From Swiss-Prot:
Lineage: Bacteria, Pseudomonadati, Pseudomonadota, Alphaproteobacteria, Hyphomicrobiales
Keywords attached to this entry: RNA-binding, Transcription, Transcription antitermination, Transcription regulation
Native source species: Bradyrhizobium diazoefficiens (strain JCM 10833 / BCRC 13528 / IAM 13628 / NBRC 14792 / USDA 110)
Pfam families hit by this protein: NusB
Family: Belongs to the NusB family.
Gene: nusB
Name by which UniProt lists this protein: Transcription antitermination protein NusB
Amino acid sequence: MADNNKKPAGLTEKKANRRGAARLAAVQALYQMDIAGAGINDIFAEFESHWLGNEVEGDTYLPAEAAFFRDVVSGVVRDQKKLDPLIDEALSKGWPLKRIEAILRAVLRAGAYELQHRKDVPGRVVVSEYVDVANAFVDREETGMVNAVLDQIGRQFRGDEFGRG
C-alpha cells in the first residue's frame, strides 16, 4: 500500500539545499559584520537583494531560505554574549575565540546558535553542515576543529542526540 502522506524526495532535498545556502550566506554575513562592522539591517538588505540566489563576480549563489538566513544571523547577533563563552569553553585551552580567524568565529557562532535554538534540525546535521561551510573557507585541520567544537556544544544542548560525555 502506498503512503500518500509521503513527500516527494525532491522537496526535502530542495529545502536542504536552500538551508545549506542560507547557512553559507549567514556565515558570510556574520563575517562581514565582524570585519566591517556592518549593521544587521544593512546586511539583510545587501544579502537578500544582491547575494541570495544571484550571480556575484561570476559565482552563482544558490537560492537560500531567507527566513532561515535571517533567523541564524539575527539569533547570533542577539545571543552572541551567551554563545561566545560556550564556544570558548569548547575550544582548546590557550585558544580563546578572539584568537580564532573571523570566518571560523562566524561558523562556530552560527553552528552554536543553531544547536541551541533550532531543534527542528537534527544536531548531527547542524554539525555536518557547518563543517561543510567551513570547508569552503579553511583547510582540513580547521574543519576538524569546527567539528570537535560543535560536537561538544551539541552534547551540551542535545545530549539525547549526541550522547553525553
